[in-house]
Amino acid sequence: PCDCVLSSFMQSFKLNDAMANFLDLEDSANLYNNVMELWTKYLKSFSINYCSVKYENIVFNFEKTISSILEFLDLPWSDNVFDFQKTAKNRGLIHTPSYNQVVKPIYNKSVGRWKYYEKNMSDIVPILNPWIKKFNY
């Protein structure tokens, strides 16, 4: 949760009503909390079949994690999953704030990055604590 909020806060999103939440660290944390609370309510109210994935698992155990995602989606394994950068480059223009990262190898520098900003984030950790505990961070 802390890395997710920090990443959203640090992105250069095109400003609109939704993205205005990411101009302030506390607003970013509150939005994360609200979205997770809503997701939890949906899970209780509806029969939702979903696959939960941690970014860290993709980074540190790519093949196993992607294999489980493909299995969930009832898709066969293909070694092409290792060539995601090539696929992204062949798509042409990518319209996301992280467009430059899509064509690069998966990297781990974002994992635990929030700890470098721990002092700045100390006020929002209590907002995120329920999710830190729930997701075992």
Protein language model features and the residues they cover:
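Acidic, glycine-rich loop-and-beta core segments that form the ion-binding/anion-interacting portion
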Residues: 2
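PAPS-dependent sulfotransferases, especially Golgi type II membrane carbohydrate sulfotransferases
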Residues: 5-52, 60-137
